[in-house]
């Protein structure tokens, strides 16, 4: 029985140069593991709270308080617990914090311990993390949803939509999907250069040109796909993350592309995009608290496209359950740091799948070299993963881990491909 013997923590830097928490766990059998916690740029109001230091150091973003929470309170509370009883460990963390949003000890402190314990237990069992968490049937490799053009909070431009993604749905394997996405990414750089547009990068490795708006960005990506030798909609489809909470003003509406719009007008805009482009997925098309607008949008176009709830659900089983009851969205974005423990994340995924919702595993804009979400995507069979462009090592680390997993699975590996998007009708391709 692997027992937690030592717990350590330190402050490290994420991909945006901001501090984050890294936790190390040692077990009585000599097993050692570490986990690093990501951080978001566009965050939902209902997420688990990150504990930051305030003050002048690192512009107030230091995490020494969270590190001390691990060393002084969390560590002593979990030392002696059985590492392979993840639910027991995570419940101890939740109980110790005692707040609904993990604001006392910090979601960043709690998550670091939760993930490090899981990784240590997997190593102790001599199993890869995806197999330890997913069991013997974990074999589905996800479609990489590559954010190759950045806007919104991820780029300093006038583009309101936060992420423009390509999805290599027609590839025969994950390795080929990764190649296709990388080739489209490089093709887009050439297209942007020809148009005299910037090829500077946003937070997640995608290009951040200051283009006229949504359709202009989609047209550029369409050209890049075809210039790379692929068929738009058959080989490679498109997806969006609007992050609409970022341009929503309570009581006023959605300040989008030069005008203020209602939820109904935004729905009309998205419906128009579906008629013009092969879109398989739209994330956060409306604000996190616009439940009525979400329900109406889902009823209107939810049978034609995947509508992913990120800020509206924040990987929280309780909010997801409410959304399911109200007919909000048809897919869940999964971010482990939104809820703060691995167990709660797995519970949210299980609820989504049981209710007919798809799931998309996701990184954050402030990432590290930690590859846990790659294993988690295969473990839960999400069929989709969003972890940035095929650039910047903190993004590529996840893709490279998925290559290793596919290789390890051998003939048992199956790439999700277009089966990950059943609402994307054949006649639209």
Curated annotation (Swiss-Prot):
Its EC number is 4.2.1.11. InterPro entries: Enolase, Enolase-like_C_sf, Enolase-like_N, Enolase_C, Enolase_CS, Enolase_N. Keywords: Cytoplasm, Glycolysis, Lyase, Magnesium, Metal-binding, Secreted. GO terms for molecular function: magnesium ion binding; phosphopyruvate hydratase activity. It is found in: Cytoplasm; Secreted; Cell surface. The keyword Metal-binding applies. It comes from the Bacteria. Its cofactor is Mg(2+). It is an enzyme of class 4 (lyase). Binds a second Mg(2+) ion via substrate during catalysis. Pathway: Carbohydrate degradation; glycolysis; pyruvate from D-glyceraldehyde 3-phosphate: step 4/5. Belongs to the enolase family. This is Enolase. It comes from Mycolicibacterium paratuberculosis (strain ATCC BAA-968 / K-10) (Mycobacterium paratuberculosis).
